[in-house]
């Protein structure tokens, strides 16, 4: 049909959707191993076209001509965590080290999407662990957060997944993760509470068994 051909033509003529990239023109994006195949991008774009019609819009008007393509590319980026392995990322930067005090990376920016409404939630993640002969490159902690956040999520599961990945790879004496986030599904719709912030935590090892360790962690992440 004419509508489908319009969408397909836009996709076929776009190098970002034909295996050479997904969302931008820089080298990192063009070689992004997490990109989606062109046929999936085309299917997603056609679905967005249908959604636009469903809400009463005209997908053929000037301002919306490229919207299906743009939304598909955005969703591919926002869900790229499905195509990345956080444990493999951690394993690339594990080092033997005798340090045995707490390691904390706090105020890691997170952006994710609620799986119930596909609306954003965003905030900060605080990640700590106590080494047991092994440490990991600090940037890898932030990358693990990023990989799990770039999926459809609930904050509770996201917090646990970060903890479990670090625990499974490093086998530390304990892991502590706290996430504080604002959910657009509570701000833009539903109860419409603009200032609500959700806090979740997931602990293991000494962060559970030692009250002083847990207390130190929670004190350190306070503003």
UniProtKB/Swiss-Prot annotation:
Pathway assigned to this chain's UniProt record: Cofactor biosynthesis; 7,8-dihydroneopterin triphosphate biosynthesis; 7,8-dihydroneopterin triphosphate from GTP: step 1/1
Pfam families, per the entry: GTP_cyclohydroI (PF01227)
PROSITE patterns registered for this protein in UniProt: GTP_CYCLOHYDROL_1_1, GTP_CYCLOHYDROL_1_2
Alphabetized GO MF terms: GTP binding; GTP cyclohydrolase I activity; zinc ion binding
UniProt KW keywords: GTP-binding, Hydrolase, Metal-binding, Nucleotide-binding, One-carbon metabolism, Zinc
Enzyme class, UniProt record, top EC level: hydrolase
EC number(s) recorded for this UniProt protein: 3.5.4.16
GO CC term, one of those recorded: cytoplasm
Domain of life per record: Bacteria
Record field: catalytic activity: GTP + H2O = 7,8-dihydroneopterin 3'-triphosphate + formate + H(+)
Annotated CDD domains: GTP_cyclohydro1
SUPFAM superfamilies membership: Tetrahydrobiopterin biosynthesis enzymes-like
Binding site for Zn(2+): 114, 117, 185
Subunit description: Homomer.
HAMAP family found in the cross-reference section: FolE (MF_00223)
UniProt name for this protein: GTP cyclohydrolase 1
Native source species: Chlorobium phaeovibrioides (strain DSM 265 / 1930)
Lineage: Bacteria, Pseudomonadati, Chlorobiota, Chlorobiia, Chlorobiales
Gene name linked to the record: folE
């Amino acid at each position: 049909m004419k509508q489908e051909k319009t969408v397909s033509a836009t996709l076929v003529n776009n190098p970002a959707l034909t295996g050479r990239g997904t969302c931008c023109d820089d080298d990192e994006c063009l070689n992004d191993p997490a990109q989606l195949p062109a046929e999936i991008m085309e299917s997603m774009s056609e679905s967005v076209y249908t959604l636009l019609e469903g809400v009463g819009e005209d997908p053929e008007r000037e301002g919306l001509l490229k919207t299906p393509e743009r939304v598909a590319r955005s969703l591919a980026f926002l869900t790229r965590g499905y195509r990345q392995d956080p444990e493999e990322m951690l394993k690339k930067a594990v080092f033997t080290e005798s340090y045995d005090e707490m390691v904390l990376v706090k105020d890691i920016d997170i952006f994710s999407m609620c799986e119930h409404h596909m609306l954003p939630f965003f905030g900060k993640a605080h990640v700590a662990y106590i080494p047991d002969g092994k440490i990991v490159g600090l940037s890898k902690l932030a990358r693990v957060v990023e990989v799990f956040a770039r999926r459809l999520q609930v904050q509770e599961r996201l917090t646990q997944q970060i903890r479990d990945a670090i625990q499974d790879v490093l086998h530390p004496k304990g892991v502590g993760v706290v996430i504080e986030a604002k959910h657009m599904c509570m701000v833009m719709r539903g109860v419409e509470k603009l200032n609500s912030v959700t806090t979740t935590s997931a602990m293991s090892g000494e962060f559970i068994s030692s009250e002083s360790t847990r207390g130190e962690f929670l004190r350190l992440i306070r503003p």
